Amino acid sequence: MAEGAVFDAQAVTDAVAEGIAKIENASTMEELKAIKTQYAGAESAMTQASKAIGALPKDQKKDAGKLMGKLRADFGRAFGTKEKQVKAEEEARELAAETVDMTLPVNRKPLGARHPLPKLMEDVEDFFISMGWQISDGPEVETEWYDFDALNFGPDHPARQMQDTFYVKGNQAKDAAGFVGSNMVLRTQTSSDQVRGLITRGVPLYIACPGRVFRTDELDATHTPVFHQVEALAVDKHLTMADLKGVLDKLAVAMFGPEAKTRLRPSYFPFTEPSAELDLWFPDKKGGAGWLEWGGCGMVNPNVLKSAGLDPEVYTGFAFGVGVERTLLLRHDINDMHDLVEGDVRFSEQFVMGE
């Protein structure tokens, strides 16, 4: 209805009816907005008719106003009802599109991989804890007395030489036991913590001492200057080699499975007497099942007991130690020590958690 046109009740009624019909057929909010602009916007027939009422004779304005009010109400009611319906349908479609099918297989995120060395350390600690033993964690910078003297190493023993041991320059100490003037070293064995345990914890004593140790070895396929040991010490009345052998057999089974077993070969260590090399029966050995060297062990030397203030006529004890890296190499058929220390993530990925 053009500007200045006369009010045409039939034309505006027909236009509104047409708009309501289109509203009923609309299926999207975009369609509804376009219909509203066309039939109720500023240029629509309904708006133009409302403007034309002002030009009508006074006796016709009232009826024209009522008609326009009814038409606007009808249009608005139809639009509002359809708008709610379309919005509900669109929301339902969006929800359906976002629905997660719980039966579908998921794309699993890669699992993290821990380095196998600390994991094996935890396994060993769990073994001893399961037997009621205590875990002892001593200092890595140690007095020479604890690392050598208390373990029956003579003053001229080759292990004391600077080509075998890292000495901490310019340091002497008075340790907790009151020994003055002892040089400081990076501990060469966790046996030093066994002596600490004897002095500070008393007897009966059953401790395992895992940790890092340091020796002046070159890094190659089988050696590294920083490595890990787990040494164990039991001191009580009436302990024998049979008790030692029983613990070693249990440890072998825990680390390598039910087919694992151990044997002892005579050897010499300053801090044990008698001493033995510890061999492991290894069914998966290349070239066929056989024995492999695993560690060292023996009954605690009476001089070590005396250094801790114990009477060797009353107390006996046994001790043994195994290399954690050595255990790991055997357990997982790793051929080169470099793999353990170079931090290549591809190596750790072989030991993904949960697998």
Curated annotation (Swiss-Prot):
Name of the gene: pheS
Subcellular locations according to the entry: Cytoplasm
Assembly notes: Tetramer of two alpha and two beta subunits.
Similarity section: Belongs to the class-II aminoacyl-tRNA synthetase family. Phe-tRNA synthetase alpha subunit type 1 subfamily.
GO MF terms held by the record: ATP binding; magnesium ion binding; phenylalanine-tRNA ligase activity; tRNA binding
Keywords assigned by UniProt, alphabetized: Aminoacyl-tRNA synthetase, ATP-binding, Cytoplasm, Ligase, Magnesium, Metal-binding, Nucleotide-binding, Protein biosynthesis
Biological classification of the source: Bacteria, Bacillati, Actinomycetota, Actinomycetes, Bifidobacteriales
Cofactor note: Binds 2 magnesium ions per tetramer.
The keyword Metal-binding is annotated on this UniProt entry: yes
Cross-referenced InterPro entries: aa-tRNA-synth_II, aa-tRNA-synth_II/BPL/LPL, Phe-tRNA-synth_IIc_asu, Phe-tRNA_ligase_II_N, Phe_tRNA_ligase_alpha1_bac, Phenylalanyl-tRNA_Synthase, tRNA-bd_arm
Pfam families to which the protein is assigned, alphabetical: Phe_tRNA-synt_N, tRNA-synt_2d
EC number: 6.1.1.20
NCBIfam families (UniProt xref): pheS
Reaction catalysed by this enzyme: tRNA(Phe) + L-phenylalanine + ATP = L-phenylalanyl-tRNA(Phe) + AMP + diphosphate + H(+)
Protein name, UniProt field: Phenylalanine--tRNA ligase alpha subunit
Organism name: Bifidobacterium adolescentis (strain ATCC 15703 / DSM 20083 / NCTC 11814 / E194a)
A biological-process GO annotation: phenylalanyl-tRNA aminoacylation
Sites where the protein binds Mg(2+): E273
